[in-house]
Structure formats: C-alpha cells, structure tokens
C-alpha cells in the first residue's frame, strides 16, 4: 500500500496514516524544499519510525509551490499516475490550505481516491471518497509512548522516574506506595491529622528545614543518617520561629515510621526510613508530584497509555537532530555544545495525545505558566493538554490567585485546585475531566 501524507508543521499529523495503515511506502507532499526536508525533517522522522518498527518504510518527498495551484495539481496528478495499480490513500489531517484545495480538485477528477482524516482528539479515523455515498469510521487505534512522542518532536529523555538519583528509578513497590500515601495525608492534613488550610504550607516549611540539614554533609557515608550538633539543633530548629511546628512534625514522622530521631548530649541523630522517603521529606513538592503520578498512571494504564514522572527533556535530542544552531560553552572546544533542557513533573500519553502536568505545592508565578505552555507547545504542537495540579492556592498566591488563574485559562492551561482536600477518586475524576480521557472499553 502507498499512502500520501500532506506534510504538516504538527509532527503528529505526519505519522497518523503510517500508524493506522502500515503502508509499504509513504509520499509526503509539502512546501518545504527537498533540501530542508531531507536535512531537518527526515532525520527526526526516521529516528521515530525506526523506534516504532518502520525502518523498512519507503519514504518519498514531493515539493510543491505553495503559491501555484497549477504546480500542486500537476504534482498530485504525477503521484497518482506513477502509483497506478496501487490503492491511493491520502491522509488529510494536516497540510496547507492551497495544497488541500488541490487535493480536493484531484478527488473530483479521480473519485476512487480514498481520503482519511483523524478527529481533533486523535481518536477516530474516518475514510471517505467521492465514489462512496458516505464516510465510514475505521476501527483503528494509534498510540505513542511518552518517549516516542518526544522523539517525533526531535527531543529525547535525559532522565525520568527518578533514575537520575536512584539506579533504575523509583521503586514503586507496595511499601513505598504506602509511604507516599502516609506522607501525602500528612502534607494535606497536617501533623494533627486534621484538615487545615495551611497544612501544605506547614509541610513545605518542615521539609525545607530537613532539606537544609540534609545538605550540610553531602558526602556522608550513610546518606539516610543525619548527625547534628545538639546545641545548634536546639537553637536553630527547636526554639526558632518554626520550632514547635518542626517538633510536632518530627514526632508525627516517627509515629508513622518515616524516620527515627535520637537525642544525645552532644548530638542529635535523624535516621530516615530509606533513601526514597528521605527524598520525599527533603524536597517540598515531591510528595504532590508522586501522589499525582500514581493516580495519573492508573488512569493511563487502564487506557493502554503511558505515564512518567520527573522527566528531564533534551530539546534537540541525543544527536541534536532538531537543532539549527549550536552555541558552545567553550569556543575552543567544539564538543562543548549547550543543550536546552526542561523538567516536567509528569508526562503522559493516551493514544497520540500528550499531557504535560506541573505540580505546585506552594507559591508560583505566571512565569511557571509560560514555561509549561512553551514546553507543551514545543513537544505536542496543536494537540497537547497542559495542566497544573495545586494544593492551597488561597494561601500560596493570596490576592494574585485570580490573576494567575485567568492568565492560565487565557493560554490554555487547566488548573486543578485544592487536591489536598480531595480523595484519590475525586482527583482522578478531575484529571479525567480536564484531560478529556476516553471511557474505558469493556468486553461484552
């Protein structure tokens, strides 16, 4: 089978026909020069297709003049004639206006041409032609993993799921999931296990204090054991402005088996349960990120999707295929290239739709909105969903809350508020709603 794809600025539009119909050959039609296509677009496309198992696919590119309807028609006629004997399939989701008009004119002349279009949510593919009375819906599903979506957009994953800190990444065994739920409950309800509007803020204060202690001796032999001078611990932590708060939380952490604290005459010893718990108790926003990830991953798994957390993205990929210019740290060292990177709290895909989720357990500014918007549009052009999951916005943002919320809405970012007051099912329902997830298919 030969298919024709109208080459588009949105990379997802360029691979729908390939994923749907598994052709032997694809012909891209577009306004880019052949040189630009082969040097800038094709390497990224081939790397993606190789990963998807299409390394043997025959790829051809036909350049048309964007301003010449005659040239467009001639090129389409040539493609049709040269592939006579083959079914002529054209995927029309992408493409420029005049090229689409040309294709319409060709379809009028050649009513046997089958056209395909995927819906705006990338879930439904319909086939139609002038020789048929009506179009038909095809039972075809296309999917990308998180990594495949980034490859398609010229990027790569530097690290994910905590593998920059832990060999093999986070260990989401039953014990760690239990600890996440315990810590999340403390973050949302406070050390007294009671609902409090300022509980997330209290959590942030205590974890920042623990982070300060954790950073004092980074080369210590036992990373989970902190040794602090007793007098200094008393003056700086126990009798400081947040001393009572810190003491209450440490006592509660002990009761929940998250850490142990031993006070001696000369030193105070804080021993974390394990390295993953230590990370959660010394990085203020991590517990919200991991809790949201577990809920989101469950939603994705039930829909054959993909979900990663703590994803660091290299914008132009391992081989710099997406770069146009590379600047150097050291002008005398050609290998000292500068890579643009971003970390996204949670990246997910369902079908072909990518989701970019940022988790905020405290104060943030409109700059964070623009960062999320930029990264989402860069690696999900036209189709990405951008979401911010938050705890106590009233306390964190104060009078600026509605200004930031309005700005988020204006640039297409969904915000889920006050998740610390909600059950897992309520959070999942809100995620399903803003992500516009399809219903789970059930076997009859």
Predicted ranges, named:
Residues 1-87, 101-341, 353, 370, ...:
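Long, low-complexity, Lys/Arg-enriched
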Residues 30, 92, 359:
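Short glycine-centered, acidic/aromatic-flanked micro-motifs in structured strand/loop junctions
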Residues 361-369:
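Intrinsically disordered, low-complexity segments enriched in Gly and acidic/Ser/Thr residues
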Residues 296, 346-348, 353-361:
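Conserved catalytic cores of phosphodiester-cleaving nucleases, focusing on short active-site segments
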Residues 92, 98-101:
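C-terminal structured interaction module
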Residues 87-93:
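Short glycine-rich phosphate-binding loop at a beta-alpha junction
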Residues 7-12, 95-97, 363-364:
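Short beta->alpha connector loops
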């Amino acid at each position: 089978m030969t298919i024709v794809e109208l080459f588009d600025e949105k990379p997802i539009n360029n691979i729908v026909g390939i994923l749907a119909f598994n052709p032997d050959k694809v012909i891209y039609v577009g306004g880019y020069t052949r040189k630009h296509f082969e040097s800038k677009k094709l390497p990224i496309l081939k790397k993606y297709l190789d990963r998807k198992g299409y390394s043997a696919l025959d790829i051809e590119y036909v350049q048309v003049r964007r301003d010449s309807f005659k040239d467009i028609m001639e090129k389409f006629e040539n493609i049709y004639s040269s592939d006579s004997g083959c079914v002529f399939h054209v995927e029309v989701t992408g493409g420029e206006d005049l090229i689409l008009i040309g294709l319409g004119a060709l379809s009028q002349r050649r009513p046997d041409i089958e056209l395909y279009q995927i819906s705006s949510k990338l879930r439904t593919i319909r086939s139609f032609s002038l020789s048929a009375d009506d179009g038909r819906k095809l039972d075809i599903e296309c999917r990308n993993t998180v990594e495949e979506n980034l490859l398609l957009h010229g990027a790569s994953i530097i690290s994910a799921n905590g593998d920059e800190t832990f060999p093999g990444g986070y260990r989401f065994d039953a014990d760690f999931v239990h600890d996440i739920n315990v810590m999340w409950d403390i973050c949302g309800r406070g050390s007294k296990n009671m609902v409090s509007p300022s509980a997330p803020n209290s959590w942030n204060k205590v974890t920042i204090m623990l982070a300060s202690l954790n950073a004092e001796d980074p080369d210590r032999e036992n990373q989970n054991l902190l040794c602090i001078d007793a007098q200094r611990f008393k003056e700086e932590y126990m009798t400081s402005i947040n001393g009572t708060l810190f003491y209450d939380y440490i006592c509660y952490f002990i009761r929940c088996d998250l850490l142990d604290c031993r006070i001696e005459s000369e030193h105070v010893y804080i021993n974390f349960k394990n390295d993953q718990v230590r990370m959660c108790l010394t990085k203020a926003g991590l517990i919200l990120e991991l809790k949201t990830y577990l809920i989101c991953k469950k939603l994705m798994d039930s829909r054959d999707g993909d979900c990663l957390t703590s994803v660091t993205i290299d914008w132009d990929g391992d081989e710099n295929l997406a770069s146009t210019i590379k600047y150097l740290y050291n002008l005398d060292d050609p290998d000292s290239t500068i890579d643009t990177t971003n970390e996204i709290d949670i990246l997910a895909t369902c079908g072909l739709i990518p989701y970019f989720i940022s988790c905020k357990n405290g104060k943030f500014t409109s700059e964070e909105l623009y960062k999320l918007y930029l990264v989402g549009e860069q690696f999900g052009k036209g189709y990405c969903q951008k979401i911010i999951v938050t705890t106590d916005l009233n306390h964190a943002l104060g009078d600026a809350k509605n200004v930031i919320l309005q700005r988020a809405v204006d640039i297409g970012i969904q915000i889920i508020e006050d998740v610390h007051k909600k059950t897992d099912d309520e959070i999942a329902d809100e995620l399903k709603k803003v992500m516009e997830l399809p219903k789970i298919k059930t076997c009859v």
